[in-house]
A protein has these predicted regions:
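Interfacial non-cytosolic loop connecting adjacent transmembrane helices
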Residues: 44-48, 94-121
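Membrane-water interface at the C-terminal end of transmembrane alpha helices
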Residues: 20-21, 119-149
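Alpha-helical transmembrane segments in multipass membrane proteins, preferentially the mid-helix core
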Residues: 61-72, 137-138
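Transmembrane alpha-helix entry/boundary detector in multi-pass membrane proteins
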Residues: 36-62
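Cytosolic juxtamembrane helix and N-cap/initiation of the first transmembrane helix
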Residues: 2-30, 137-146
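C-terminal TM-helix exit segments that contain a strictly Trp-centered aromatic cap at the helix terminus
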Residues: 32-43, 86-103
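Loop-to-transmembrane helix junctions at the membrane interface
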Residues: 68-97
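Core segments of transmembrane alpha-helices
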Residues: 58-64, 128-133
């Protein structure tokens, strides 16, 4: 009787692939969006200026579009990741880390800092800034990888 050649590991037909760095980074960025949004809800949406509210809403919509493009494998996903990732990191840094400078400030520092700022607020803003930078870098790498082939 011949020996069975049927694999028993349960991984028949499944190739082990490395996760796509852009998708992983997009997931982290989406998580950062949720955490940062939760902090704004905790602090109250009425503590920010209308300019901050509407610019933040636009950033959220464009971020969700970016994440969707990345997960659909759309050719514009990496380019959107570069634009939204770096713009988010710069925008959140300017709004939260600089002392109050304009109607676009939701400053965590300075004499006129935003109300209800806690350690969680600092974590949320820092997480979103870092995730934005990571998304921008992952997008650049994906764009360069696409052009290199």
């Amino acid at each position: 009787m011949a020996a069975s050649t049927t694999p028993t590991s349960g991984t028949v037909g499944l190739a082990r692939r490395r996760p796509d760095p852009l998708r992983v980074t997009a997931l982290v960025f989406a998580a950062a969006l949720l955490v940062h949004g939760a902090d704004h809800l905790r602090r109250g949406v009425d503590v920010v200026t209308p300019e901050v509210f509407w610019l933040g809403t636009l950033q959220l919509v464009l971020s969700l579009i970016t994440v969707a493009l990345i997960f659909r494998g759309h050719r514009w996903g990496p380019a959107f990741a570069v634009g939204i990732g770096f713009a988010s990191a710069i925008g959140f840094s300017a709004a939260h880390l600089l002392p109050h400078w304009s109607a676009f400030s939701d400053a965590f520092t300075g004499a006129h800092h935003a109300p209800e700022v806690t350690a969680f607020s600092w974590f949320a803003a820092s997480f979103e800034i870092a995730a934005g930078l990571a998304l921008g870098i992952a997008g650049l790498r994906a764009v360069r990888g696409t052009h290199a082939s």
